[in-house]
Amino acid sequence: AEMLQVLAQDMGLNNLSYLGFHKTGASGSDPVIHSTYDPAWLTRYQEENYHLIDPVVDKSLEGTLPVDWSELPKVDRTTRNFFGEAMEFGVRQNGVSIPIRDHAHGKAVLTLNSDLRIHEWRKYKRGIIADAIYLGCLIQSDIVANLASAPPGPRLSTREKEVLKWAAVGKTAWETGQ
C-alpha cells in the first residue's frame, strides 16, 4: 500500500486501489486487495464481501474497457447504498476502474479515484488512462510473480484428507484408526 500511496500522490489522485482474483490455495479466488483507501473501509469491504456486489468490480470483470463510475446505472437500492457507504469512508465520486487480465487467467481491477470537479476529472482521465492501463498491467505482473514465488501450501495425502474428513464429522481418533 505504501507504493500505491506514492503513486497516487504522484498521479494527483485521492486513492489508488488494486483488487485481484487469483487461484491460490484452498479458498479458490479470494480477492487480493492493495489500496490507499481508508483502512476502516477496506476492513468493511472485506468483512461484508462487497466485491460480490460492487457494481464497479462486476462491470470491470465482465469487460475489457475502463469503467467510468459516472456511467454506471445507480437505480437499484443495493448500488445506491453501496456508493453511499463508500462515500462515508472517503471514497470520492469520480473514479475509473481498469480491468486487467493475465496469462494465468487471473483477473484484477485497478481503480483511480479523485475529488476533482467533473469537467477537470474528464480532462484528467483522458490524459492519464493509457498510463493507468499500463500501470495496471505492471502491478498485475508483479503480484502474479510474487504469488508464483510463494511456497506452495501443504499437500495432503489421500489418507490425511480422509482423517481430516472423519475428524470434521466428529469421529474420535480411535474410530478413525479402525
Stretch-by-stretch model annotation:
Residues 2-9, 13-26:
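Short, hydrophobic-rich beta-strand element in sensory/regulatory alpha-beta domains
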